[in-house]
Amino acid sequence: MTNPFDSAGSKAPPKPFTVSEGRREVRSFVLRQGRFTPAQQRAFDERWPRFGLDYTGQPRDLDATFGRPAHKVLEIGFGNGAALRFAAQHDPSRDYIGIEVHAPGVGRLLNALADDNADHVRLYHHDAVEVLQNEIADGALDEVRIYFPDPWHKKRHNKRRLLQPAFAELLVRKLRPGGRLHCATDWEDYAEQMWDVLDATAGLVNRAGPRGSVPRPDWRPQTHFETRGQKLGHGVWDLLYDRT
């Protein structure tokens, strides 16, 4: 097991989370680790062997990983882990995989999963594109959730947004027919881009119709990102797509 942060505090940061732009790769996030508390460090030391998935670059048998056949739900960029923990608590019949590059959020969720005895959850602390490309088999996922990705609201930074055509096509490959993609954002401009990209992606059908959104589903709790956005006067858009 390769500990992302050993107990001495030496870092082994993940590679940049990237989206394609022509021949070069554009980072879709800026890595800000923030304060790493002693409790979060202990989480990596003690909890990672139970709940963590080390990146190997090889296809992974998810049924073997979880020890059962069950619907597989992937959340990309789970932040502090509130939505992923909520889902795991309220529907333990599913298996959940979370990907997050910011170590404090991973450490926090590791501790919460131990408190919940949530052995139907596994976490990656790695580049989501690499995980999807190399470790998740085509058609292996029943659902992908992407909640409040970085909006990169300055126009010159829009190319850094995660939801780009190449990434959408990658998601389609990893979802089984009949699967589901659920995205949420509190930036109207990003919702517009999501519609531009996802409505035009072969293999995805907007459940609410072209450029449509749905009320917040019961399986997504109101997150601190959403609360913050509403305080700033932002709307919230939930986009739900079926994989054909």
Curated annotation (Swiss-Prot):
> What NCBIfam families is this protein classified in?
tRNA (guanosine(46)-N7)-methyltransferase TrmB
Q: Give the enzyme's main class according to its UniProt record, as a single word.
A: transferase
Keyword Transferase attached: yes
Q: According to its record, what are the GO cellular component terms? A: tRNA methyltransferase complex
Q: Please name the pathway.
A: tRNA modification; N(7)-methylguanine-tRNA biosynthesis
GO MF terms here are: tRNA (guanine(46)-N7)-methyltransferase activity
Descriptive protein name: tRNA (guanine-N(7)-)-methyltransferase
Function statement: Catalyzes the formation of N(7)-methylguanine at position 46 (m7G46) in tRNA.
Reaction(s) catalysed by this chain's protein: guanosine(46) in tRNA + S-adenosyl-L-methionine = N(7)-methylguanosine(46) in tRNA + S-adenosyl-L-homocysteine
- Where does the record place the region Disordered? 1-20
The entry sums up its family as follows: Belongs to the class I-like SAM-binding methyltransferase superfamily. TrmB family.
Keywords in UniProt for this one? Methyltransferase, S-adenosyl-L-methionine, Transferase, tRNA processing
Mind telling me which PROSITE patterns this protein's record contains? SAM_MT_TRMB
Report the active site residues.
D150
Q: Which PANTHER family match?
A: 3-DEOXY-D-MANNO-OCTULOSONIC-ACID TRANSFERASE/TRNA GUANINE-N 7 - -METHYLTRANSFERASE, PENTACOTRIPEPTIDE-REPEAT REGION OF PRORP DOMAIN-CONTAINING PROTEIN
Which gene is this protein's source? trmB
Enumerate the residue ranges of region (Interaction with RNA). Answer: 156-161
Task: Cite the binding residues for substrate.
Answer: K154, D186, T223, H224, F225, E226
Q: What is its EC number?
A: 2.1.1.33
Give the Pfam families listed for this entry. Methyltransf_4 (PF02390)
Record-annotated residues binding S-adenosyl-L-methionine? E75, E100, D127, D150
Q: Which organism is it from?
A: Stenotrophomonas maltophilia (strain K279a)
